[in-house]
Design a protein with these regions (language model features):
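Core catalytic alpha/beta fold that binds nucleotide/phospho-ligands
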Residues: 1-173
């Protein structure tokens, strides 16, 4: 079924055991030749498995961590980011990439960890949707695009950033 305008397909995968090198695109095979250590990385295998299984045409955006990968596909520009929800020292990241307003929102939040990840994943998703470099993180506002969050088992947060969306279709693979 083709993707319609206003739809975002979000594919989520947790296990790389179904991955096979036969699933790789020509581009990914060249990448693997250049960086052979990628073959040992769970996040690489998992994200490539999602790309293979999705088989949808449109604009794609990919994000992955060690034990999860997410792939967003849409007719319009879309950005996605996934992060593991875990305590860490957020101060350095906040100083580097949060605006004054974002820092104030974080500081006044009841659940600081969740608020940090909501802002941070939104900024990364916006960067991806706008095809900007990571160095632009400080200049991007977390609320400059529409966004939706998905928290999975209190372990991961996923943020989608987009301009127009009527439906989000989530598939766990």
């Amino acid at each position: 079924m083709p993707i319609k305008r206003g739809e975002i397909y979000l594919f989520i995968g947790f296990g790389a055991e179904k991955f096979s090198p036969k699933m790789l695109s020509k581009k990914d095979r060249r990448k693997l030749k250049k960086y052979p250590n990628l073959a040992n990385q769970n996040s690489f295998k998992l994200s490539r498995y999602l790309k293979f299984r999705a088989k949808k045409r449109g604009k794609i955006c990919l994000s992955h961590k060690e034990n999860i990968a997410v792939l967003a596909i849409s007719k319009e520009k879309v950005g996605v980011d996934v992060e593991e929800l875990k305590e860490r020292n957020f101060d350095g990241v906040i100083k580097f990439c949060f605006s004054k307003k974002e820092s104030e929102i974080y500081a006044s939040a009841k659940d600081k960890m969740q608020k940090f990840y909501e802002i941070y994943t939104a900024k990364e998703a916006v960067i991806k949707a706008k095809n900007l470099a990571f160095s632009n993180l400080a200049n991007v506002k977390f609320d400059e695009m529409e966004r939706r969050y998905l928290i999975i088992n209190n372990l991961f947060i996923i943020c989608l950033a987009f301009k127009h969306c009527k439906d989000i279709i989530v598939k766990f693979l």
